[in-house]
Amino acid sequence: MTVSPFSQPLLRDKQEALDIQDLQGLVCLNLKVGSIRVFSGFYTRIDQVFILWGLICAGIFLTAQFLAISWDTQAIWWSTLTLVGSIAMVVLTWFWASVEKVRWLVYCWVILMLGGVVLTDLSIFLGWGEVLMRLCPLWLGLTSIGYLCTVLALRSRAFLLMALIHLLGMAIIPYFSEWQFFTTGLVMMISLLIMAELQWDMRPPIDSDLLTPEQKLFNQHQNQRRQLADLQRVKN
């Protein structure tokens, strides 16, 4: 008996039965003060990418909101940071995306991020006032497109929810007047950190020629463990 993907919660506590592609580069944190555990968690490379972009988004939009730094200087700083973030994203996600057969999704996100940077820089250096006044809706819109592409790739309702949140933000952000950058940064950062901290739903595992027979067998066992846990949750 298998569990339908639609029976999975959109978001839940992380499952510990991870596949090979998720175990690659796994970071485990166990912070203690004396004998008291303050925080414990683990982060796959995909989670690490979410955290990275969450911090980048916070840095970019909160700086634009609160610090008196020229637009030209910000454009140079944030273009460089976005380029570094895009390269890091490719490096961290490439094996996972290859196994899951969604390399095109990585390309999509890179194109969206770099395309957004180009539009932002042109609006600043060439004085495109109409674009400059709509940078927040622009970035919320680009991010929602990325999430929708992720929905197509992974059949995930959690990413659909994130896409809808960003589309809603795109529609209402003009009403926040002087707090547009703060609100945009907050929406993007919190969304990314939620996806990094929790387990999101996705389509069933697929067979990959990149894995050895032993790795495929390991993934099958891990999938069975996850299905058993899901069945127990449904029964309870």
Which residues does each predicted region cover?
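Membrane-proximal helix-loop-helix units in multi-pass membrane proteins
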Residues: 102-163
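N-terminal juxtamembrane cytosolic/stromal segments of multi-pass membrane proteins
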Residues: 1-46, 229-234
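Physicochemical signature of membrane-embedded alpha-helices that form the seven-helix bundle of GPCRs
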Residues: 52, 135-142, 184-187
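Selected alpha-helical membrane-embedding segments in polytopic membrane proteins
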Residues: 36-117
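Membrane-helix interface and helix-disruption motif detector
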Residues: 65-79, 124-135, 175-184
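Terminal transmembrane helical module of multi-pass membrane proteins
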Residues: 146-235
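Membrane-embedded alpha-helical transmembrane segments of multi-pass integral membrane proteins
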Residues: 56-60, 85-88, 143-146, 169, ...
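Hydrophobic alpha-helical transmembrane segments and adjacent interfacial helices
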Residues: 58-66, 114-126, 146-148, 166-178
